[in-house]
Every structure is written in structure tokens, then in C-alpha cells.
Amino acid sequence: MKLPIYLDYSATCPVDPRAAEKMMQCLTLDGNFGNPASRSHRFGWQAEEAVDEARNHVADLIGADPREIVFTSGATESNNLAIKGAAHFYVKQGKHIITCKTEHKAVLDTCRHLESEGYEVTYLDPQSDGLLTLPQIEAAMRPDTILVSIMHVNNEIGVIQDLAAIGELCRARKILFHVDAAQSAGKVEIDVDAMKIDLLSLSAHKVYGPKGIGALYVRRKPRVRLEAQMHGGGHERGMRSGTLPTHQIVGMGEAFRIAKAEMAEENVRIKALRDRLYDGLKDIEQVFVNGSTEHRVAGNLNISFAYVEGESLMMALKDLAVSSGSACTSASLEPSYVLRALGLNDELAHSSIRFSIGRFTTAEEIDYAIGLIRDSIGKLRDLSPLWDMYKEGIDLSKVEWVSH
């Protein structure tokens, strides 16, 4: 077993060797290196063929038509293109957007930008388990609502929203439905037709593909129109100009093909490892799982260890690659905004650790992690005066602290 152990698959995944192998064949002179937009020679035709094959694999995973797949640089760009693109195109129909407070920053900050352009955004509060209810979303809808943007699986707490019900509601009200599926593709079944999704953002590196490539699903029937955010040669049906990176697209296609073939079997194995990890930790005193345990992606376990600082625990767990909050925001020392939105106090939010398990995690690694975590929690609590006070039965919420 090699140290450190990687338990941060929600931040990124290593590229599957099968996808990496395919990518290597699209880089050098003796490989498929051409520009897919070069129509006048074989190098271009072969590259275009490879891109088309990958596009089919991406479409297959979500039940889409390949013509509905637009390649982008990743889910952040896809979210920007979907939300800004739809908001700008349909501005005459209204300027109201609905989203959730626990969305990824790529959605929240895009919405904030639109607010500066005069759009109105309703940010819904999730329930304490991280899920939204249908009446909540329906109550927020107005005659001028043009878009609802809700993520499928949350990147921090792994909860799965009921997209089919939300899609049904949006379609009945003739409101566009955008889904950030960066964390769910390859882990949870997605059917864009059955779920009545109009726009769906995808990322390759969360599905064991390369970084720097993603896609946006844009429905053709009923047709969804977007205003391009990137202008140039008119690639990707005018929605996203720029030379297509054949090697990255091929890597993404192969990763999505593997995901479709192996997802069901892989989920059983990963969920067993996740349960093994939780079973090894659940009898520690004052340990809380954040987010719904029932509606949850297989590889995610987000736990708060009361009376232990998340940052100090991460330092103690230097042999484990885990995160406190998401990688995109964990550089700040603020408590997770996702956990705050669930109603957790600052102390519990600060004491949270996200473990995310993936394709290459082993039972041996999980057992090692359990031992290390239990040992570290014990040592850190021994150093904590707050833990001593808690053990003495003092209600810390009633203590009046004196500032110096």
C-alpha cells in the first residue's frame, strides 16, 4: 500500500489508463494529431472521426443525441455558457432565475454576475439534509422565470436531487431546466429525456478523464437556444468557438464509455467501501454525517467531528488526501457555505471532513484510514479544553466567553 492515500475523488480523479492510452494516440506525428475542422485532407477527417466517436460515447451516458453535445473546457465553462447563454437569449421573456444556495461556485458566481446585469435570482434554502422540495421550487416560480438551475449531486455532501420531479415541473411551466452534473455523471443514472432536462453540464476529470475538457448538453427538441459566450470560428454549431482538442475529447469519450459499461458494478464496490469507512468511525462520540444518507452518491462521506478543528485534523491526517469543503473554496478559512446552508453552526461546519472514494480505492486503504482517523481524533480531543468541558457536562452554548 502506497502513502499518502487518495480519498479526494470529488476534487478530481486520476485518468483511467485506458483513456490515457487513447489520448496518447492523438498527439504526435505518427498519431491522429490533425485538426478536426480541417476538411481538405485525411489528417482532419481522421481527427473528426475520433471526435465524433467520443461525442457518441458522451451522449450515450446521458441518453442524448450526439448532435446535442457541445464540447467546452470543463463544467465551469458549461455552467457559464448554459446560464449566461440562456439568460441573454431569452431576456425578452423574463429576467428571473431560480437556483439553490448549495450550488457550486461556478453556478452561484455566474448568477451573481447576471444580477449585476439586472437579472433577479432566487437562491433557495435546502432542507437540513441538503435536499430541495418541489413545493419550494414551485413557490419561487414567477411569470418572468426563464431558468431553473439545480445540481444533480452536491460536490461537498454528495446528496442527489430529484431531477425527474423538478424537470416535470419546469416543463409544465415552460421554464428551462439546467443541471450541473459534474459530480453525478458516471456515478448516477442520467436520462435527459426522462428527466426533462434542457441543459446539462459535464466534466471529464470527475469521470476519470483528463482535465480541461467538458461538455454541455443542449436540447434540440423542444429546441433550446443559447447566446455564445466565446466567439471565433463558429465551432460546435456556433455555440463554442475554438479548435477542438482531439486528444482531450478522445480521453473524455473513452472515460464516458468505460463509465457506462462499469458504473453499476463499480457503485456496488464503492458503496461497500464507503459503508466500511463509516462503520469504522460511527461509534466515535459526537460524530455527525452531513447531508442525506438515503439520497446520496456512493463514494461520498462528509462527517463533522465535534470539538476538533477540520484544518488541524487534516494536518494530523497527512497520510490521507481528504478535503475540508470543496477544492475550489478550501483555500479560504471560512466554514463551508454548503454546510452553513444546511443550518450547521460554525463549529460543526469547521470540523467537517469530506472523504470521497473512487475507482482505485482499496479495502486495505480504508482500514488504514479508519485507524489513522480514530487515533488522530483521540489525540486532538485530548488537547482540547472544549472537549474536557463537554465531557464534564457543561453546555458550551450557554458559556459566556470573555473577549480579550
Swiss-Prot record:
Record's subcellular location: Cytoplasm
Residues modified to N6-(pyridoxal phosphate)lysine: 206
Paired cysteines (S-S): none
A molecular function (GO) term: metal ion binding
Residues the record marks as active site: 328
Organism domain of life: Bacteria
GO CC annotation terms, alphabetical: L-cysteine desulfurase complex
Keywords: 2Fe-2S, Cytoplasm, Iron, Iron-sulfur, Metal-binding, Pyridoxal phosphate, Transferase
Cofactor field: pyridoxal 5'-phosphate
Binding-site residues for pyridoxal 5'-phosphate, renumbered to this chain: 75-76, 155, 183, 203-205, 243
Broadest EC class assigned to this enzyme: transferase
Keyword Metal-binding among UniProt keywords: yes
Subunit structure: Homodimer. Forms a heterotetramer with IscU, interacts with other sulfur acceptors.
HAMAP family the UniProt entry points to: Cys_desulf_IscS
Name of the molecule in the record: Cysteine desulfurase IscS
Organism field: Tolumonas auensis (strain DSM 9187 / NBRC 110442 / TA 4)
Annotated gene: iscS
